[in-house]
């Protein structure tokens, strides 16, 4: 009874060479129709699955390998005499090596196929054989990745068989492969069927490794970046293209995500500068260069080594301005050719990053890892519920423009946060303080440090004011209008303080905590 290898692959990469090497090593090659045809065309002696089972492929190939003579050969425990006796009685022979990859479900979805074609590309027999082989890895070598053909052949040539360690590694890879495959299917069908089940009792999320990163948040931490195969239509920082410069770091990805999410809030030409996941300068202007210079002037100290994001293509004037200080990453929908050439010549290590689907919204929910589990929530894509003026004085049109600008910015600042703004540019940003009044003081100190006048500015707070103290302080710095969610039990006291100081106040009815 010679050794047998079952090969049934949709991805034919390297399969002919693999089968030829197995044939040289004395393996009988068993294959299903499509793969068998390719192997036969290349001079390989193949036994078709239907010849083993005595049963033809039916229903257009839907049923071909789901048969006891296949699965018995895969699942037989070779050191169990009773199992082997049953195998012999049923005329079943063990299968030693299995090479399978599955119907191209993901690729079918990406090409825009209709639902019938998508469902037809859900593999049934393939995963069954993969799982059976992986379960019986003590005796069976399962290969789901063409990249592993070479190492298996080398080991067979050197040792005559694969080691248990190799079979375990390949079995684990196989189980991951089928789990990934099924999670892609469930994610896609959830969307295609239009079933609004936001938080199902059980779910899995597929991710595919894109790159191993140099390290994680700190040098002693290892890290990698993964992409979602089912969120391919939406904005994707994970699949961003580094057009020039060093590879992206873990922290670069986090900062780019923060910068892109904020700059996309604006329809007008805008620039955002981010440092350690918080904006340090944001501005709107008529050109990308002017927006950048305005944003930079708000906190040039923090901007050093920062990430700069635009919502317009980078032109040559902007490129020249960007080379004046050290920056880590420039993010934009695109780069004009002369701007790109200038930046690549002047800054060899500066990362120039083009975001995939910049004009689209990010897909999927927001996940946060906690010990022993995960938190899942909707993305914070809304801006406000209703704009309601709650004070005696209404904001002027210009103040309202600045209030809405500041509100968009504060939504993306770590809580507790306060943003002071004027003329569609930040004046001071107070992020991540444990009290709201401290956030205000931090924002004011930043403004004072860079000689930015707070007189006539506006203030945004991402959550309500628990006391009137922040409003009293804001008045001392010449702030003329405030935007906040409202909802405090002391709202009346806060509104009274605003009225006393002649400050216009707008409630949004929506909080934007960010942790």
Curated annotation (Swiss-Prot):
Its EC number is 2.1.2.3, 3.5.4.10. Keywords: Hydrolase, Multifunctional enzyme, Purine biosynthesis, Transferase. GO terms for cellular component: cytosol. SMART domains: AICARFT_IMPCHas (SM00798), MGS (SM00851). PROSITE patterns: MGS (PS51855). Pathway: Purine metabolism; IMP biosynthesis via de novo pathway; 5-formamido-1-(5-phospho-D-ribosyl)imidazole-4-carboxamide from 5-amino-1-(5-phospho-D-ribosyl)imidazole-4-carboxamide (10-formyl THF route): step 1/1; Purine metabolism; IMP biosynthesis via de novo pathway; IMP from 5-formamido-1-(5-phospho-D-ribosyl)imidazole-4-carboxamide: step 1/1. Pfam families: AICARFT_IMPCHas, MGS. GO terms for biological process: 'de novo' IMP biosynthetic process. Residues 1-144 form the MGS-like domain. GO terms for molecular function: IMP cyclohydrolase activity; phosphoribosylaminoimidazolecarboxamide formyltransferase activity. The keyword Hydrolase applies. InterPro entries: AICAR_Tfase_dup_dom_sf, Cytidine_deaminase-like, MGS-like_dom, MGS-like_dom_sf, PurH-like. It catalyses: (6R)-10-formyltetrahydrofolate + 5-amino-1-(5-phospho-beta-D-ribosyl)imidazole-4-carboxamide = 5-formamido-1-(5-phospho-D-ribosyl)imidazole-4-carboxamide + (6S)-5,6,7,8-tetrahydrofolate; IMP + H2O = 5-formamido-1-(5-phospho-D-ribosyl)imidazole-4-carboxamide. SUPFAM superfamilies: Cytidine deaminase-like (SSF53927), Methylglyoxal synthase-like (SSF52335). PANTHER family: BIFUNCTIONAL PURINE BIOSYNTHESIS PROTEIN ATIC, BIFUNCTIONAL PURINE BIOSYNTHESIS PROTEIN PURH. Belongs to the PurH family. The IMP cyclohydrolase activity resides in the N-terminal region. This is Bifunctional purine biosynthesis protein PurH. It comes from Persephonella marina (strain DSM 14350 / EX-H1).
């Amino acid at each position: 009874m010679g050794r047998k290898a079952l090969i049934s692959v949709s991805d034919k990469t390297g399969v002919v060479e693999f089968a030829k090497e197995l044939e040289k090593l004395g393996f009988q090659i068993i294959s299903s129709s499509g793969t068998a045809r390719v192997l036969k065309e290349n001079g390989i002696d193949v036994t078709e699955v239907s010849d083993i089972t005595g049963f033809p492929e039916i229903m257009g190939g839907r049923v071909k390998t789901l048969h006891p003579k296949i699965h018995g050969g895969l699942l037989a425990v070779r050191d169990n005499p009773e199992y082997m006796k049953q195998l012999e009685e049923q005329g079943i022979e063990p299968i030693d090596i299995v090479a399978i990859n599955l119907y191209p479900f993901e690729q079918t979805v990406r090409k825009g196929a209709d639902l019938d074609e998508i469902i037809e590309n859900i593999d049934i027999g393939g995963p069954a054989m993969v799982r059976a082989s992986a379960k019986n890895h003590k005796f069976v070598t399962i290969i789901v990745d063409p990249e592993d053909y070479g190492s298996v052949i080398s080991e067979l040539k050197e040792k005559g068989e694969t080691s248990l360690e190799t079979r375990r590694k390949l079995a684990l890879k196989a189980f991951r492969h089928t789990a990934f495959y099924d999670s892609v299917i469930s994610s896609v069908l959830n969307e295609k069927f239009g079933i609004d089940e936001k938080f199902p009792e059980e779910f899995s999320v597929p991710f595919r490794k894109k790159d191993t990163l140099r390290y994680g948040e700190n040098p002693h931490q290892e890290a990698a970046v993964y992409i979602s195969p089912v969120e391919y239509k939406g904005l994707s920082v994970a699949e961003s293209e580094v057009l020039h410069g060093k590879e992206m770091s873990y922290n670069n990805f986090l900062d780019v995500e923060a910068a892109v999410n904020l700059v996309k809030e604006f329809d007008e030409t805008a620039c955002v500068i981010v440092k350690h996941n918080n904006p340090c300068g944001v501005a709107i202007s008529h050109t990308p260069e002017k927006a950048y210079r305005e944003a930079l002037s708000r906190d040039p100290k923090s901007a050093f080594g920062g990430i700069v994001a635009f919502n317009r293509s980078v032109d040559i004037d902007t490129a020249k301005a960007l080379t004046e200080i050290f920056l880590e990453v420039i993010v934009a929908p695109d780069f004009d050719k002369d701007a790109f050439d200038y930046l690549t010549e002047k800054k060899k290590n500066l990362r120039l990053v083009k975001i995939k689907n910049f004009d689209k919204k990010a897909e999927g929910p927001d996940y946060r890892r906690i010990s022993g589990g995960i938190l899942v929530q909707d993305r914070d894509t809304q801006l406000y519920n209703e704009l309601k003026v709650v004070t005696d004085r209404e904001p002027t049109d210009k103040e309202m423009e600045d209030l809405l600008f500041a509100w968009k910015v504060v939504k993306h600042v770590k809580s507790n946060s306060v943003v002071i703004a004027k003329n569609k540019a930040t004046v001071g940003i107070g992020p991540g303080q444990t009290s709201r009044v401290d956030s205000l003081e931090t924002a004011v100190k930043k403004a004072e440090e860079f000689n930015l006048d707070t007189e006539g500015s506006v203030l945004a707070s991402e959550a309500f004011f628990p006391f009137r103290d922040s409003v009293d302080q804001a008045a001392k710095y010449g702030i003329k209008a405030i935007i906040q969610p409202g909802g405090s039990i002391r709202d009346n006291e806060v509104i009274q303080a605003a009225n006393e100081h002649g400050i216009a106040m707008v409630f949004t009815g929506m909080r934007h905590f960010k942790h």
